[in-house]
UniProtKB/Swiss-Prot annotation:
Its EC number is 3.6.4.13. Residues 287-479, 1144-1319 form the Helicase ATP-binding domain. It is found in: Cytoplasm. This is RQC trigger complex helicase rqt2.
Length: 1935
């Protein structure tokens, strides 16, 4: 016995200290540990023979009698003895409880033996027999006694931590799951032979079938002590064979039956169309897989039908998105919401992915679902991904997709099911990827609060419970384990180990292979032989053939007697594969990926027909093709792995997959599988195939890189989150179960059961390594982890941190291709590649003939070899050696990815070496050097390619493109090919670039690029899109000043593209810059545009800064007015420093003033001081306050109305598009608060409006908006008011309020300011402000915005954990998305409602009043939303809750910064871009908007300082750093819209000639700026002559445009006069292009649809908001409209199309799909009435009566929200009229009656369903009497008398669906009765009160009769503009 045990011990000792030592350590991960499996038989024999280990079948009654007297006292004594011995550290009481628990857990005595063996070791193995034999007696006695008292007898001094030994006894069993036992080398102190994890499970799980874990094959430590029962061992001279018999089929369980497909719903029935029933496993899994959403782990043998289980899970997910009344009824239609979900199937290999795509695609095609492969070989476009519901991918590819923060976030958001196939590859090197994916998915589920189901498919696992826990599977529901007994065709497994030295082992493998194949063929079976290279398939087949002949068994290979032999022979004869033809004669075939597809299919067909008996193939056949055989044989297990640069063992995945091909259930009841390996690997394969070793984690191998991925993604932002993240990995599961494997001592696990310290140690070390490599910023004090560009790039391109370390040292700003290739060669990705002596000769040849770049290292080194083979690959050199070919492919695959990473790193460092790196990257992709001719990238015939290279190489592409086809033909000496060459030249993607330079300041330049594609698009070569890089390079070629990406597609290739950006320029100014446009994929497709800076004039705008003086704060008593002091005293007692400084100038002088100061510094007080002075000194004058936005107007009206109006006894009025006060109210007002456009429109008629002439003070708030598109209006207002003042001799004081600007001098000069200029620094604030600018990478907007949410949450926790926070976003959608993510982050906090400060009762009451769903969801978490899409009440609730500190966070659009004064301690500007449909992309916000947002940071009455965080795109950080502190120069926008404003002045008579216009311009701000910065505006120089020429040209162009629009006409050579159209344009405040378009397209008989079209085409809708993807919404709405938007001939993304659609949607009363469209509809309806009125006037001018009536009808329809055919029914809400006639009859009958009478008449009417609405509409309907008379030949008199009272004093019509109240109005038309020509038109309205404030019910109208219509028969029509009301009177006009 000692000798045999020593054999075992000595054999184990040979494995080394890593697997066998005195210290606690495990060898579970060691490859050599697998040899334990081979010793299992030996150990069994030793234990049984010498240790009397009992087999339960051998225990007899007499044996039991011998032990009958053993009781608990005996057991107690035994435990005491064991505890006192030195072989265990266990306390007696603990050991006693563990033994009892083991006895209670199972009746399986073999299992009890193994448990006790682990507990007490081999030293006490004799006691085990006694305990096992007396187990029933011991348990019975134990159950009858008090276990606590028994335990107390064992050890007086022992007390468990839990307070009871019983509890600790159970705890011991649990702890033993992860506590290894020591193995001592001392014979005198022997412990158990086997160490490792104890997986002692007492629970019985409902779906574990055939688990032998507690039987005699699997031990409590998760490893087998012995091979399965019945295993045999055969020892031959040349090899050893272990035969594992196939498992017996699992017997049918009670009640078990196969599930019939016919009993399922339609989804399953049609998907499993060819099935009658599911198989056993599928039937058992079905209730959970299809009926629930549980996570699942299905462990079952290969070939058991797991793929169909995955399909069931897919169908369950799909069913959640299917609309059907009854899924059991096939006649019911199915509507699948395909865009709402994604399913991801993760396959271990690309070949399997392709197979899954084919299978799933066919099965689910009937549902219209698309299945696509997304792997390294199969890339998908964004559109393809959007169209795909089921993505089949590999772990690495899905890792790449999900780790990109700027990836397709919508893809990740829509994933609802992740299926992981072959999850047992966790133990493989690639297992770390699976762990990373599962952890990321589970954390995404938690943060997003959206369920993502995870389904794992696996072969049978020894520790499947660990994997189930890792996948988040409920053990009692989603865990399914099926032993090999459930395999459809049980497999007998043969493990053969070839003996001998390395020189002869291959020969012995051949011998063993032949022996087994011969036996199988003799038995009449087919066999598939798997080898590991294409070449070996042929060699093995030929070797076998020779052996058959040598042994005289060649007759067995004769297949000529097969019935289909002749047909097969004919097919084979057509093949060009010589080996295939030759081997076919001997019933042998070959199959590998190097064969033609037709030959592979032929081989598969012949084998399936049985004609081929032997098939030699590679593993690709096992993965890619379902071709089973009775027997499979793996010949050899060594294959070349280029990633490691050496031969490695065949992976268990491949072995199991190949073994899975054994067996054809339809033909045989069993199968056989062989694996032939070397003898030293035999035990390894026995272990892994028979599941003897538990699956361990390999996550630590990739921990550093995976941590970097999570930090870069933004899901891990500090060490605590990293520790939490590690808790989701399989590593964490296994560290707790088997700690010693991972270097964790038992005591450490006891003290820290959750391993928090160990996890913190692991992530801290990993974070330190990342920080050392400049990949992240690691703040060790607070644990923050902040990603850096280098880390993001490494994560996105799957670059490991060792390579990054190399790059940090070797990457330079200037590098040649040779330098870059040398750098690539040293990357760690290639460190495993070895240089072998047998390759040197070929490498030398390749270096000499195919390596144009000089080598830095010897080919005997790894880097030298990589260098050569990479260059050879680019040169398309042929490589002979097999391993060298594999290495070349591996290097090529990785080099492209690494060079892309290098390119981005170089760009992030602004290094010009980026160009060279990009060029090399394209060379690798194209396999062509940059010095070769670009045309070679096309598929040129070989002879033509040679001629192009030889003849065209010296000519540039520009020269070639200028040549004719004939010249090109002559050049290449082949005239026929001239057109071909010309065609290819035209397809090379090149760009033309025109550059405009716009100096902003003395060191900042704006470049505007007009880019025009200069090539012909060909889908074959260009695909769907082409990417270009636009670089701005300095004159030295060393630095990239700026870079942009430009994406072209076939749709926009024919249009020009504008790019605008700013760059810093150095001092002294460089002579030129280079604009370089480079194709992302095409070599030689480069355009270099030099830009000279010699003519650029940078004016030094000396910015006058007003220093803040050290003054004593001025008390409010300085006002010397008790009323004003009382107003101020409610808020403060002293003016602040800024107010103190400007107080005297504003309050005691009449000089014009400019106050430039940051938001929040008290500028409003300047307006109040000036107002008080104006009203005091000029009491009859008016003050006009002009704010740029309606929101600001409303804020000012609310503020001053509350504070000033009543105390001062003054009146104030609001003038905006939302309010229309009558003239009397405006005339009586002291203060007018209005918008620029409204005041501009009013002052255009200043001569007829006395209140305009009475203005003494005009306040221009936010005057820095001069530079915006609305700025010209401000210029015109100031210029016009100055003109009015000069005409009336009344001075108008101007006060301009602004943020600090960089060119305040120009503003002061324009405003005629001398002593009143106050331009304070940005830092001058009552509350100091800290500003942080954070850059975020990525070009895609939405993913970038999403990546900002986690940093925003962290910023709140850092800067303002309890104080108010204001988050500004760019759109309404972003408010919702941001709130959603913040809520998810709150959910992960200890207190999810940390931002809420009100009780539940108050919250419920408030939420009940909220309408918006997103706001309802956000408020309970202390987050409010604010945007224009909310109702007024919702906005008010959000504002009040935030101001009153009931909620801490307010997420708002940028308009809130202007509109509502809601300061906060912390302001986060989340993105500085917004979507602009005009450019079809995202545009930067005005800097003034950003400054306004920042101004909301800091609360003067609460905060000592404020904090602002600006989140911007990384490339824009420098821009904001510069201008946020220096101020942005204010430029003019007037030159872009000069024509419209000149038209207004011409219409009013202010201008009548070009010189007058020139003189008028001198009064504008534009005139001053064009002299200061002429190049910015397009002047040729900075001298006066150039500027005058520019201005003259500008004015002449404007006049010409107005003439084209018929707005002006030339009176004589110099003088111009306005036309009626020009006056209409001015009066209605329209663009002249609107009227031009109308006049050009309108026809006399135009119908309603054309009227609607021309309305939508108005230029006023040019700026209607278009958001991302709204074209898709437009398409859907358009389908429901009466008139299609196709009539506009514009793309669906166009603003005019949207206006057309919204206008109709309003009339059709459609429910709009998004809230944004509701607000947009209001915006459109704000404009339409004004435009329609102008169209009516123009139509009247043209004499088109029909058109006038059409537009009046359109106006009625818009107000009543209906089409013309529904106008009567729409005008009578509450009436269910069946026709228009019926509605009209009601109207004629009931309109104008009194309210009481109507209620009485209609109360019982069955057609009335809403009597209140109906009555309101009827009583508001005007009932009139009209009299027409002619007082003279040129006058027509009309008398209109209203017979009923209006609904209200303002004569508002009943139009509940129109957004604003509409007053009742009428059109009076005089129309020729015969020709229908319109002679005259007049508006009339009863609205407007009399002087005595009574309402007016009668009108007298006098109309001029044109001479042309006298003595004509005319009809006078009075048409209501809001109701379908027409009065007609015919009259013959007198002469």
């Amino acid at each position: 016995m000692e000798v045999e045990l020593n054999y075992v011990v000595n054999h184990l000792e040979k494995l080394g200290p890593a697997s066998f030592c005195d210290t606690p350590y495990s060898f579970s991960l060691s490859d050599s540990n697998a040899e334990l499996g081979a010793l299992s038989l030996k150990v069994d024999e030793i234990l049984k023979t010498n240790y009397n280990l009992i087999n339960p079948e051998d225990v007899t009654d007499s044996d039991n009698n011998e032990f009958a007297l053993k009781d608990l006292t005996w057991l107690q004594n035994c435990c005491n003895e064991i505890s006192q011995s030195s072989s265990t550290e266990l306390d007696a009481s603990v050991l006693f409880e563990a033994v009892i628990m083991s006895l209670k857990a199972t009746e399986d005595q073999c299992a009890i033996q193994e448990d006790l063996l682990n507990l007490v070791g081999l030293d006490h193995i004799d006691l085990i027999s006694d305990i096992v034999a007396n187990s029933s007696n011991l348990i019975e006695e134990y159950m009858n006694q008090n276990d606590t008292s028994i335990a107390a007898q064992l050890s007086d001094g022992y007390t468990s931590e839990a307070g009871s030994s019983a509890t600790h006894g159970q705890g011991l069993l649990d702890s033993l799951k992860s506590r290894p036992r020591r193995f001592s080398r001392s014979r005198d102190n022997r412990g158990p032979l086997f160490t490792g994890q104890q997986v002692f499970e007492v629970e019985k799980y409902p779906h574990v079938y055939g688990d032998k874990r507690l039987g005699n094959t699997i031990s409590v430590i998760g490893k087998k002590f012995a091979l399965p029962a019945g295993s045999e061992r055969e020892d031959y001279q040349k090899y050893e064979e272990i035969i594992v018999p196939h498992a017996q089929r699992a017997p049918q369980m009670q009640g078990e039956k196969l599930l019939e497909i016919s009993s399922m719903d339609i989804l399953c029935r049609k998907t499993f169309l060819s099935y009658q029933t599911l198989n056993r496993i599928q039937s058992l899994v079905y209730p959970i897989a299809y009926k629930t959403n549980e996570n699942m782990l299905i462990c079952a043998p290969t070939g058991a039908g797991k793929t169909d289980v995955a399909l069931l899970a897919m169908l369950q997910t799909i069913s959640n998105y299917v609309e059907s009344m009854n899924l059991m009824d096939e006649s019911e239609p199915l509507d699948v919401h395909r865009d709402d979900f994604k399913i991801v199937y993760i396959a271990p290999m690309k070949a399997l992915a392709a197979e899954v795509v084919e299978k799933m695609g066919k099965r689910l095609a009937w549902l219209g679902l698309k299945t696509r492969e997304l792997t390294g070989d199969m890339q998908l476009t964004k559109t393809e991904i959007a169209e795909t519901q089921i993505l089949v991918t590999t772990p690495e590819k899905w890792d790449v997709v999900t780790r990109k923060s700027v990836g397709d976030t919508q893809l990740a958001e829509k994933v609802r099911l992740v299926i992981i196939d072959e999850v047992h590859m966790l133990h493989d090197e690639r297992g770390a990827v699976i762990e990373s994916l599962v952890a990321r998915t589970q954390r995404l589920v938690e943060t997003s609060q959206q369920m993502i189901r995870i389904v794992g498919l696996s072969a049978t696992l020894p520790n499947y419970l660990d994997v189930a826990d890792f996948l988040g599977v409920n053990r009692y529901k989603g865990l399914f384990y099926f032993s090999s007994a459930f395999r459809p065709c049980p497999i007998e497994q043969h493990f053969i180990g070839a003996k001998g030295s390395p020189k002869i082992v291959n020969s012995n493998i051949d011998e063993a292979c032949f022996d087994k194949v011969l036996k199988l063929i003799q038995e009449g079976h087919q066999v598939m032989i798997f080898v590991h290279s294409r070449k070996e398939t042929i060699n093995s087949a030929k070797k076998l053939r020779e052996q058959f002949f040598h042994e005289g068994e060649a007759d067995l290979l004769d297949n000529s007697q097969h019935e289909k032999y002749s047909l097969a022979q004919r097919d084979v004869s057509k093949s060009k594969n010589k080996e295939l033809k030759e081997l076919f004669k001997y019933s042998m075939g070959i199959h590998n990926a190097g064969m033609l597809r037709s030959d592979r299919h032929l081989t598969e067909r012949l084998f399936s027909m049985g004609i081929l008996k032997i098939l030699c193939c590679t593993a690709t056949l096992a993965w890619g093709v379902n071709l089973p055989a009775y027997a499979v044989l793996i010949k050899g297990t060594q294959l070349y792995d280029p990633q490691k640069g050496s031969f490695v063992d065949l992976g268990v995945l491949d072995v199991l997959q190949i073994f899975g091909r054994a067996g054809r259930p339809q033909f045989e009841s069993s199968a056989v599988a062989y694996i032939i390996t070397t003898h030293d690997k035999l035990s390894h394969y026995i272990s892994v195939v028979t599941q003897q070793s538990p699956i361990e984690s390999r996550f630590t191998d990739r921990l550093v890189d995976n941590l970097n991925a999570e930090v870069s993604l933004g899901t891990v932002t500090n060490i605590d989150e990293a520790v939490s993240w590690l808790g989701y990995t399989y590593l964490y599961i296994r560290m707790r179960r088997n700690p010693l494997v991972y270097g964790i001592a038992y005591d450490e696990l006891v003290e820290d059961p959750l391993l928090g310290s160990k996890r913190r140690e692991l992530v801290s070390v990993a974070a330190g390594r990342l920080a050392d490599n400049q990949m992240i910023v690691y703040n060790k004090k607070n644990g923050y982890l902040i990603p850096k560009d280098l880390g993001r790039i490494a994560s996105n391109y799957y670059i490991n941190y060792q390579t990054v370390s190399t790059l940090n040292n070797l990457l330079k700003s200037k590098m040649s291709e040779a330098d870059i290739i040398a750098l690539l060669s040293q990357c760690s990705e290639f460190s495993q590649i070895k240089s072998r002596e047998n390759e040197h000769r070929e490498l030398e040849s390749l270096m000499e003939n195919s390596s144009p770049c000089q080598l830095r290292d010897s080919i005997s080194n790894t880097s030298g070899k990589v260098n050569v083979i990479l260059q050879s690959y680019i040169s398309r050199a042929h490589v002979e050696d097999f391993t060298l070919t594999s290495d070349t492919n591996y290097v090529a695959q990785n080099a492209g990815r690494i060079t892309r990473a290098l390119f981005e790193i170089a760009m992030s460092r602004t290094w010009a070496s980026a160009f060279t790196i990009l060029s090399l990257n394209k060379s690798i992709d194209r396999r062509q050097w940059s010095f070769e001719h670009p045309l070679l990238q096309f598929d040129l015939p070989h002879d033509l390619a040679v001629k192009v290279e030889n003849q065209c190489g010296s000519l540039s592409l520009e020269e070639l493109s200028d040549m004719s086809t004939g010249e090109l033909g002559d050049l290449i000496h082949n005239r026929k090919m001239g057109p071909t060459v010309k065609k290819f030249i035209s397809k090379l993607p090149l760009l033309n670039i025109n550059v405009d330079l716009l100096p902003l300041t003395k060191n900042v330049l704006r470049l505007v690029l007009n880019i025009t594609p200069n090539f012909n698009w060909d889908m074959r070569y260009h695909g769907n899109s082409q990417m270009f890089w636009i670089f701005v390079e300095d004159s030295n070629g060393l630095e990239i000043l700026h870079h942009e990406q430009l994406l072209l597609n076939k749709r926009n290739v024919s249009t020009s593209h504008l790019l605008s950006f700013t760059i810093p320029v150095s001092n002294p100014l460089p002579s030129q810059l280079y604009i370089i446009a480079v194709s992302d994929k095409w070599l030689g497709a480069e355009t270099v545009t030099p830009v000279s800076l010699s003519n650029v004039v940078f004016h030094d705008d000396s910015n006058p800064i007003t220093e803040l003086l050290d003054l004593q704060p001025l008390p409010i008593t300085a006002l010397h007015d008790p009323v004003l002091e009382g107003i101020c005293a409610k808020r403060f007692s002293f003016f602040n420093a800024v107010q103190t400084q400007f107080f005297h100038t504003i309050y005691h002088t009449d000089t014009n003033i400019f106050v430039g100061a940051p938001t929040g510094s008290g500028k409003t007080m300047a307006a109040e001081l000036a107002t008080w002075r104006a009203l005091h000194n000029y009491p009859k004058s008016k003050v006009v306050y002009i704010a740029p936005m309606k929101a600001l107007v409303k804020e000012r009206v609310k503020d001053w109305g509350h504070r000033l109006v009543e105390p001062m006894g003054i009146s104030m009025i609001e003038l905006t598009g939302d309010t229309n006060p009558d003239v009397k109210a405006v005339t009586n007002a002291n203060i007018i608060i209005t918008t620029p456009e409204k005041w501009d429109g009013i002052t255009r008629s200043w001569k007829s409006r006395k209140y305009v002439q009475d203005v003494s003070l005009i306040i221009l708030d936010e005057i820095h908006l001069l530079g915006s598109d609305r700025g010209p209006v401000l210029e015109m207002i100031v210029s016009r008011m100055n003109y009015v003042a000069s005409q009336t001799n009344k001075k108008v004081r101007v006060l301009g309020l602004s943020t600090a600007v960089a060119n305040a001098n120009d503003l002061a000069n324009w405003l005629n300011i001398r002593d009143g200029l106050f331009n304070f620094r940005h830092s001058v604030r009552p509350v100091p402000l800290e500003i942080y600018i954070d850059g975020f990478p990525g070009r895609a907007y939405c993913p970038r915005m999403m990546s900002m949410n986690k940093p925003a949450f962290q910023a709140i926790k850092t800067h303002s954990p309890t104080q108010p926070v204001l988050i500004f976003v760019s759109s309404r959608r972003q408010t919702r998305l941001t709130a959603k993510d913040l809520i998810a982050f709150c959910g992960l906090e200890d207190n999810p409602r940390r931002f809420l400060y009100m009780d539940e009762e108050e919250l419920e009451m408030i939420v009940s009043e909220v309408e918006d769903k997103s706001l309802k969801l956000a408020l309970p978490f202390g987050i409010a939303l604010h945007h224009a899409g909310l109702t007024e009440n919702d906005r008010k609730i959000s504002e009040e809750l935030f101001v009153n500190n009931k909620v801490q966070i307010l997420i708002a659009t940028s308009t809130l910064a202007w509109g509502v004064n809601t300061p906060a301690h912390l302001v986060i500007v989340k993105g500085t871009e917004y979507y602009d449909a005009k450019i079809g992309g995202y545009k930067d916000m005005d800097l003034t908007d950003v400054l306004q947002m920042l101004g909301r940071a800091g609360r003067p009455q609460f905060d000592n300082s404020g904090v602002a965080r600006i989140f911007v795109q990384d490339i824009k950080k420098s821009f904001y750093k510069h201008f946020l502190h220096s101020g942005f120069p204010v430029e003019s926008y007037l030159h872009k819209v000069l024509d419209n404003h000149l038209n207004a002045e011409i219409a009013t008579g202010t201008i009548d000639c070009i010189q007058g216009a020139m003189d008028f311009l001198t009064c504008t701000y534009f005139y001053r700026r064009v002299h200061q910065n002429p190049v910015y505006y397009g002047a040729d120089g900075d001298d006066q002559k150039s500027i005058d020429t520019y201005l003259s040209k500008l004015v002449v162009t404007a006049f010409n445009e107005l003439e084209k629009s018929a707005c002006i006409y030339r009176v004589n050579e110099e003088t111009y006069a306005p036309t009626t159209l020009g006056r209409i344009v001015s009066y209605y405040y329209l663009f002249h292009t609107t009227i031009r378009n109308f006049v050009q397209k309108i026809t006399e008989n135009a119908e309603f649809d054309l009227a609607l079209q021309l309305l939508a085409e108005a230029s006023e809708f040019d700026d209607l908001a278009i958001r991302h993807n709204e074209d898709l919404i437009n398409i859907e709405i358009n389908k429901s409209l009466k008139y299609s938007a196709a009539c506009l001939n514009l793309p669906m993304v166009d603003a005019h199309v949207k206006a057309f659609i919204l206008t109709q949607a309003h009339m059709a009363r459609l429910k709009l799909p998004v809230d944004d469209y509701v607000t947009d509809t209001s915006t459109v309806l704000d404009q339409v009435i004004r435009i329609i009125q102008s169209y009516i006037d123009v139509s009247a001018e043209l004499g088109y009566s029909h058109v006038c009536l059409q537009y009046i009808s359109l106006m009625q329809c818009l107000k009543q929200a209906c089409y013309p055919s529904e106008i009567y029914r729409a005008s009578l809400p509450g009436l269910n009229a069946s026709s228009e006639k019926e509605a009209r009859d009601y109207l004629n009958k009931f309109a104008g009656n009194k309210t009481d009478e109507l209620y009485q008449m209609l109360c019982n009417d069955p057609n009335v369903f809403d009597i209140e609405s109906l009555v309101n509409s009827l009583i508001s309907y005007p009932k009139m009497n009209i009299e027409v008379s002619q007082s003279s030949s040129d006058k027509l008199l009309l008398y209109l008398r209203r017979l009923n009272q209006p609904l209200n004093p303002d004569f508002y019509i009943f139009a509940p669906l129109f957004p604003k109240p509409q007053s009742e109005g009428f059109f009076v038309l005089i129309i020729d009765s015969e020709t229908q020509e319109l002679f005259a038109i007049r508006r009339a309205s009863f609205a407007g009160r009399r002087n005595d404030d009574s309402i007016r019910l009668s009108l007298r109208i006098s109309m001029d009769i044109p001479p042309t219509c006298r003595n004509r028969n005319v009809k006078v029509m009075v048409v209501c503009d809001g109701y379908p009301l027409i009065y007609e009177h015919k009259i013959v006009l007198m002469i």
